[in-house]
Structure formats: C-alpha cells, structure tokens
Amino acid sequence: MQQTFEQISVVVQGPVQNYQGRTHHEEGITQRCLESIRTHLPGAKIILSTWPDQDLAGLDYDQLVISQDPGVNLVDGLPQFPKNYNRQLVSTQAGLAQVTTPYAIKLRSDNYLIGNEFVAIQHSFLKSESEHKVFEEKIVINSNLFRRTSHGRSVLMSPSDFFYFGRTANLIKFGNSHYSWIILLPNMLFRSCSRLPNRAIH
C-alpha cells in the first residue's frame, strides 16, 4: 500500500522555469520540481507562490498564489547581496498563508525532491519540553549552504534557503523571525554564496 501525504502542503516559491536572468538553471527546472513532489509525496497539496507574468504552461500545481514583486534588497538605495531575500520572504509567506494542513514544506522553485525520508526524520524527534523552546516541533532544513562561517568569520542565523519542513505554524513563525532580522540588521547579511550543482533534496 502506497504511503500518502495528505497532511502536508508544499509551498513552491520563486520565479518559474528559466525566467529572464534565470537561464543558469536547467531547462524546465520548476516542472521537474513539481513532478518530484507528485512522485515522492503523493497526496500532498502543491501551492505555487510566484510573481505576475510567469510562464505557467504545463505546470502541475493545486493552487496558485501571485504576489507583487518587491524588487531587489536595497540599503541606502543600493542593491545588497543576497539581492532576492525580500522576494523569497514575500513569496514564502504568501504561500504559507494559504496552507490549511498541519505540516508544510517550503521548497525553492529551482530545487526538487529525490525522496521523502525527511518526513520520518522530522517525526523521529521528540517534542521539546524545554522552557526555552521556540517551536512546537523540530524543523528539518537541508545542510547545503547552512553556514557556520563566511570569509573566515563565524556567522549566526544563516540557514540554507532551499528547503524547510515542519509544522505549518512553526514555519510561519520561522519566516516571521527572518523578516524581523532582515529589517533590523540589513548590513549583516553574508556577502558571498557558493553555487552548488546538486539541487536535489533527499
């Protein structure tokens, strides 16, 4: 009997396919992303959260969320790196706001799944009973670009932005905390980012 995942919604966020300056990705990357969800998370709801005027032809999703593009990050009128942080926050939060299932995944539209082991991993951890806990349950985040250092210096609050899985309410709280941090400390963003060829999530 095939396992189903009706308790999970997947928010696929970002521009779709090889859109404008996004030609460094493989052709049809968003279609591959959506197909991987159908394959590895049968029964899960797919929410595509993107921008106006995207080419949605041939894309398999259950719900579409369109947000106005906030543009690149600016500090004192100058573009900052990573330049699309505000875009990622807006599309992620808009998608999560539509989730009605207890669990959710945030997945970039240029990444894809190659398995569903992360569900069992998340469920294998006991709920934290600590008085200092932030979330009801653990959030699973992939390790690619989960930074401990940048340019030889230790950095804080620098998780990867490819993939999150956990309780929907916890992901919303996590996203809101990121929003507060980016507003308060815009100049503390790390300044370099490695390009990784492998964008698959196990």
Outline where the language-model segments fall.
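Active-site-proximal specificity loops/subdomain of glycosyltransferases
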Residues: 48-98
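Short, flexible/disordered intra-domain loops and linkers
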Residues: 17-28, 76-84, 116-125
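Active-site acidic Asp-centered loop
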Residues: 107-108
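N-proximal low-complexity "stem/linker" segments adjacent to membrane-targeting elements
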Residues: 1-31
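Catalytic core and acceptor-binding pocket of nucleotide-sugar-dependent glycosyltransferases
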Residues: 113-120, 124-202
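Hydrophobic targeting segments
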Residues: 6-12, 37, 45-48
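Short aromatic/hydrophobic "clamp" motif used to bind/position activated sugar donors
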Residues: 104
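Short, acidic, metal-binding catalytic loop of nucleotide-sugar glycosyltransferases
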Residues: 27-44
